[in-house]
Amino acid sequence: APARRVLPVFVFDDGADGGRPPGGARRWWLHHALERLRASLSERGAGLILRRGPTLATVLSLVEDTQAHAVYWNRRYDPAGIAADSDLITALRERALEAKSFDGHLLHEPSRLTTGTGGPYKVYSPFWRALAASGEPRAPVAAPKAIRPLPEAVASDALESWSLLPTAPDWAGGLRDAWTPGEAGARQRLAEFLDARLQHYAEGRDRPADAVTSRLSPHLAHGEITPFQIWHALNRPDLDTPARDLEKFRKEIAWREFSYHLLFHNRDLASQNVNRDFDGFAWRPDAGLLAAWQQGRAGYPIVDAGMRQLWRTGWMHNRVRMVAASFLTKHLLQDWREGEAWFWDTLVDADPASNPAGWQWVAGSGADAAPYFRIFNPVLQGERFDPDGAYVRDFVPELARLPNRYIHKPWQAPADTLSEAGVKLGATYPVAIVEHRKARAAALAAYDAMKGTR
């Protein structure tokens, strides 16, 4: 039988379905990802139709225009996406059309893994054990060599009309230097990781200056590579990789799965504390402190390096994400939702599950969260994970000439050392906006006060 005609479509609801519109960094990525997807489909004989608007109305309009008799799409897992998908299936089936959604985003459906009592997991370790015992995820499917298009043209939005790219100012230069959006870029990133970095992953993944992490997160977030493609690639017989590195990386993939499990069972994960005790936490809103953190002017080099890496490249090393998030919520007592919103706007891998789950984990309000009294000392974190200061020197160049012993605590450097390095605290580099011991004491006092009001 001849192949059925296929019309590839990308529907950009941009918040019209009730979900969160993508932030600036993801909008930049989306523009380039769609350009590359369009080129890839063209090589296979098909075009890419772009439509912007609510999913239901947009798809039904296309169905009417094309007289389509079947609609297939990749399933969504954010609350608004789940609701929109459900409405779409109902509407299509009411019209006697075939409607199917597919699991292109996760290893397992978020509802599949349950505890012994049939409930959701709230702790990562047993979730990981259940996932590891659930068998191999399905094998990836190869892309078709050719697609049989519709004989007649179908109206499409012009990608440029969506205005996804920054213009005044164009802040995306660092993103262009750092990333290659699209499926080909994802495949190249995975190949480089497997061939050169995976064998150092378990030992080196916490050192931000060492390029041993996969940096696949933005490709995963945009559906350019799937977790089961990555999972099965780890089974390659020619990989000469120690078992501990393989397991550690698989566990990081499982953290992403766990985040979606949490989102599925906590639909307001980005706006409400999972641990409702934190509803009584006395955050201290301060626009000046928040801005200093956002702009990499906190006066703690490892924190500032992370925030500047984020602004320059749209990405931040995971260890530094934890340190920067802890600093905002515990040293500065700013609501985790402020930090989550900033990451949502500036990360190319901003994810509706991983982003809020990570912030709640650090803040202490989430499922399986780090204890609130675990307050990262940014100096010690820098000295442990960036011992020679290479990461700080890259993103905080005004400190580059400081000796290693002072690179994470410039305020302890003698005056002549600062002078020789061209550093003038309060002028060329900010004075620390809080003192660690005082900030830690204030955070613990706020936590004790919250516990006293329960």
What would you call each of these model-derived segments?
Residues 1-139, 143, 354, 445-450, ...:
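Trp/Phe/Arg-rich N-terminal binding region typifying the photolyase-homology
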Residues 30, 183, 209, 296-299:
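Generic alpha-helical segment signature
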Residues 32-35, 57, 301-308, 441:
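Short, contiguous clusters of charged residues that form electrostatic/catalytic patches at enzyme active sites
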Residues 118-277, 386, 390-454:
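Glycine/tryptophan-enriched, flexible segments
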Residues 211-398, 404:
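Active-site-proximal binding-pocket segments
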